Structure formats: C-alpha cells, structure tokens
Amino acid sequence: VLQAGGFTTSIRAGMAFLDWPLSNGSINPPGWLTEIDKFAEHSHRLAATGLGLLCLAIAALHYAREPRRGVRLAAYALAGLVILQGGLGGLRVLLDQLNIGGDGNLKAICFAVGHAVNAQLTIALLAVIAASHTLAWRQANPAQPRERLAAKIAAGAVFTVIIFGAIMRQNHFTSWVTSGSLTELFLPAGDGLPWLMNLFHRSGALVAGVAVLIFAATGERRASRWVPLALLLGVQISLGVLSIVLPLNPHVRTIHLVVGAALFSTLCAHAALVHRAKSSEA
C-alpha cells in the first residue's frame, strides 16, 4: 500500500480519478491497466481496501481471542486508524481544486499530508501489535529509564522528520541538488517555506539518525536492535541522497518512503518492547 501510494504521489497521479471511493464509477475502470497514472492510483485504492479489511479482521480476532487488554486496545486503535486513513484519502480527492474549484488547493493538500502521516502511524501500530505476539515480548526484562527515554526521543525525532517529508512531497517542495556540491545536500537552495521544509527535513534526518543509533546501542539484546535499525538507517540515508540528486526518478523517492516506514515501524516495535519491559502487564 505504501509503495503504491508513494509512487502515485511521486508521479503526481493522485487525481487520476476525480471520484471516490470508486474510480470513474467502477472498481474496474477503463484504462487502469494501460495508463500509468490510473494504474498507480487505482492499484493504491485496491491495495488500501485489502489492508483495511485485514486490519478490521485483526481487530475482530483480538476481540475474540486476545486476553491482554493493552494488546486488544491496540488492535482496536489499528482499526480506527485504518478507517481514518480511508477517510483522509477520500477527502483529499473530493476536496481537490479539480472538484471544488477555487484559486488554491490548501484543503486537499492538508488532507494529503494527514493521509501520508497517518499511513506511517498505521503501519507502525501494526508492527507493534505483531511484536506483542513474539517470544521477545514475553521474555522482556525490565528496562532502565534512560533506555525508555532514548526510545521516546528516537521515535519522536523520526516522526518529526516524517511530517516534514510529507509536507515536502505533497506540496512538491523538494529542492533538487543539481550543482554537485556536497554543501547543497545539507543546505538546500531556494527560499521561503519550501526552503525551510527542505532544511528541516534534511537537518532533522541527521538528528534523528543520531537518536536512533543512541537508542540502538542502549540496553540489553543490543544485536537484535542494533542490526536492523542501523541497516535500515544506512539504506534510508543513502536513498535520501539519491532522491534529491535524481529528480527524474520517481522510484527512488518511492523506495525512500517505504524504507522510512520500515525504519519507523521497526523503531516503534523496539520502543514498545522497551516500555513493555517495565511492566508485567499487556
């Protein structure tokens, strides 16, 4: 779902269909298998529908079979987030300038940013629920306060970077690196709000990266935490650099989004494990 949605944004195909939830009034609209913009948007809608049904099934199964109250509540929250996600996506389409007219497109962009950010939260919560059914969760040892603090700081920093990235992508604010200058990787060209969002996203990514590494190096079971987080962080930073030096390649930006979601969800799962470790509940 993230790949399909990210690719749709990368090629600016979010309004390939002006209606919602159907696409041109159909679940099998003409041209969606042959026209790339229609394929991107309609495949995103189909995949999102499948994920939504899966999340509702997860919530129902936890209601029927899960004895731990905290995990059940997380499953219910997942169902709520996925329903909200569908609504945000629909409003992004229905309130677009192409549908309601007007001089600006602020309403649609706000819902698009919310849709992008909520997608990350949905996947992260799904990862936490999955982690709650692992052996590591059941065998968790008490965590130190500094470890829990490091987890919160890392998760908050990464989520902040995600918000700036969503604002950049949905407004098409990305400042490309065309001069070959290393400085331009960290100090984007331009001015105004686009420049500010690029600066916050890039500098924030460096701060978040350090926070992730600090958390990865704390506490017990360091290898199981350090290896996936460090690997995902390294790949994500590399993709971030490629994203701004290859402006004509939508696939790199899409993969950057997907790996970012993998990093955030993995981080949230480990953070939940740390907070689970301080209590015998859930």
Predicted regions: what they are:
Residues 1-282:
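Polytopic transmembrane helical bundles with strong interfacial aromatic enrichment
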